[in-house]
UniProtKB/Swiss-Prot annotation:
GO MF entry, a single one: GTP binding
Location relative to the cell: Cytoplasm
One Gene Ontology cellular component annotation held by this UniProt entry: cytosol
Family the entry assigns: Belongs to the TRAFAC class translation factor GTPase superfamily. Classic translation factor GTPase family. IF-2 subfamily.
Primary gene name: infB
Protein name: Translation initiation factor IF-2
Domain tr-type G: 418-585
Main localization, broad class: cytoplasm
Organism: Streptococcus mutans serotype c (strain ATCC 700610 / UA159)
Region span, G3: 473-476
Amino acid sequence: MSKKRLYEIAKEIGKESKEIVEKAKSLGLEVKSHASSVEESDAKRIVESFTVSVEPKAVTPTSKVEKEAKAQEGSVAAEPKAAATKPAGRPRPQNRNFKAEREARAKAEAERRQNNGERRNQNKGQNNRQKDNRNHGSQDRRNDNRNNRNRQNDNRRDNRNHFQNRQEASKSQPTGPRFDFKARAAALKAEQNAEYSRQSETRFHEAQEAKRQAAQAKEKAKKLNQKEQPTVEAAATAAPQAQPQTVEQVTHPAAVDTRRKKQARPDKSRDFSHENEDGPKQNKHKKNRNKQNQVRNQKNSNWNKKNKKSKNNRNHNANLKPVTERKFHELPKEFEYTEGMTVAEIAKRIKREPAEIVKKLFMMGVMATQNQSLDADTIELLMVDYGIEAHQKVEVDTADIERFFVEDDYLNPKNMVERAPVVTIMGHVDHGKTTLLDTLRNSRIATGEAGGITQHIGAYQIEEGGKKITFLDTPGHAAFTSMRARGASVTDITILIVAADDGVMPQTIEAINHSKAADVPIIVAINKIDKPGANPERVIGELAEYGVISTAWGGDSEFVEISAKFGQNIEELLETVLLVAEIQELKADPTVRAIGTVIEARLDKGKGAVATLLVQQGTLHVQDPIVVGNTFGRVRAMTNDLGRRVKVAAPSTPVSITGLNEAPMAGDHFAVYEDEKAARAAGEERAKRALLKQRQLTHRVSLDNLFDTLKAGEVKSVNVIIKADVQGSVEALAASLLKIDVEGVKVNVVHSAVGAINESDITLAEASNAVIIGFNVRPTPQARQQAEADEVEIRLHSIIYKVIEEVEDAMKGMLDPEFEEKIIGEALIRETFKVSKVGTIGGFMVTNGKITRDSSARVIRDGVVVFDGKLASLKHYKDDVKEVGNGQEGGLMIENYNDIKIDDTIEAYIMEEIKR
């Protein structure tokens, strides 16, 4: 069977949902609200229960005598009640909700009409028999109502009670299943007309009554005036106070009977806002027309003459308030100030007038106004003059992240727990650092590095014996010195890996220096012991020369011989790391807000700015507001070294985060703030300071460096744009290019950034005539098309030293070429031939080297160069040839020279470009 909801049943029978719910509960149905469903049979039961309750009651005939007695009884009872409750002064009626009353009356009228229709259908015969009695009774009721109308209108409260009784009666009447809107509209209109009629009739009778009272008061006053003048004056002053309503009514024109009109003109002296059907009238923006017929002549105006007083009288009679004396405030004993406080602020703090402080400053020789800022020295002198001990307020710089790393009270010693050691693997190029890390993590990351060089720092975490170890892998190339220095600053232990066959190399020495500068213990891993030429003892001896002495030799450095390729002695190396970490007692407070260091940063095309962070103290959570270097943001997502999403990062944990508005610099510190607003303010302030610092580094032209600046204009430059995959590579590449030393040419890095090569880079390169160098990145398809159209050169590389070589060659090519003279042969003139219109031909024999067609020639006579020029033609017998070898004969002509003589020496030479 189908089900129906309770509100559908209520809609069908014209009932409220609340009544349907109550009826259903009374019938024993389990329902909760109007949206509950019931079976079809239960729905019929509910409808039938309402049908039974609305059946009309039998009409009991009422005799004319009973009706007259009832009406007479009601009128007799109403008269003493009205007489007893009628006050001396008519009270102002309270506002009522007329709209709700009108709807209730209309609803009651509609239900009454419908019930009357049903009664007519059921009791048609009975109604026909009593038709005469009903008509006669209706006529009697109309007469009774007409007689009692005046008494009902005398008291407004009775009228209101009458409406309330009618409303209660209408509510008690049963309602039909359907609602007649036409009947409701007719009842509404009839009620409005009746209301207007009652108001009009009430006003008419009130006006008549006021007129009679005014005439009586006037006649009484006239009689009293004839008897005694003082008594009249007293009565005249008392009359307006005793009857303010009556006197005010006289000023209005005589009331007219307007009962036949739908709405009479409202009485301006009374408030009829309660009779407005939609509530009180809003007369805020309407003009006041209560006295619109009065003459408004300003010169002859006599309004309020009795109450007017002259200015002199008002001034003399005014009660002058005594001047309140200012309370004397004691000066404070101490005053905490900030530099730049104004005079007004100081006056407010010490409870003194600004004029007093300005006067004191003037006596001290300082000209100031109350809105002028004062420096610290002036404020202290002023406080000394007042006898107040002044001390400057120490303001905490919220933009200073470094304070979290040096403040002792930031960490709670009671909450300190043991943390994982951070280990940095350092060593020379291709000594096996990434291979060792690959062996530790059981992955093949090492094979993916180009040229055997780790291009950027990687941070990984492994577990050994139930304890975690965090590893940082640093590049070995000389260009990545700054990255190795950053790695040493955040590490706890350094693993110095040295190849057993190569020994100590330049980057090995550099790694030792970084570790010693950071005061980090060194564990030496001698790698490649599986090779035939391995000599670990030689490595130990070489390291001892640089201060890294083995514990076997009485030093403090642990030495472990390993083979990263075959995994030999790896467990021993990890145990050594944990042993050194245990000696150091590494601890962190996980309860504070997280602080740490940026290991690496890059710009991802889909994710935006991505930063690899190492949490050093506290715990980093997703959605934490964070300031990283000179940028800020909120941690949107966080992934660990395995690429898995995590929500929490404990101390010594490397994570990669997204949500920053820019890519930070590698090595920057980060800190979590209490809310995003504070983080934004700190980040913007740090960015502003960095920009200001960068501008201050810009050199200005002065008389001292003017000559150097003009001379620098002669120096040519190679403009380059650097784009790399990570920030560390960008820094290293830019630093390496700037170090290239080619006389007369310098490198100018126009722009460097992280991310793929895009259209804006092409536009910038075209405008600045620059070469774009992409390091481990590729141009977008749109950028590639634009580069081809604009003829912009893009060089893509994955190994840094190849980039350096290529740029160095380009720099050398920008210099003007230098040539040197190279003598390739000599010849002796044996005979000369003069040909008309051609010139002099010299027959020669090559005595040394060779004579070529494109070479230059000098004519030497008696050891003196008489001419230097180019060959016009070269022949061997009658054939034109390119060269004539040693011992051969030939003929030649020299451009613009015909004075060749026998025994002249011809020296052939070429100009060769000197390679730089």
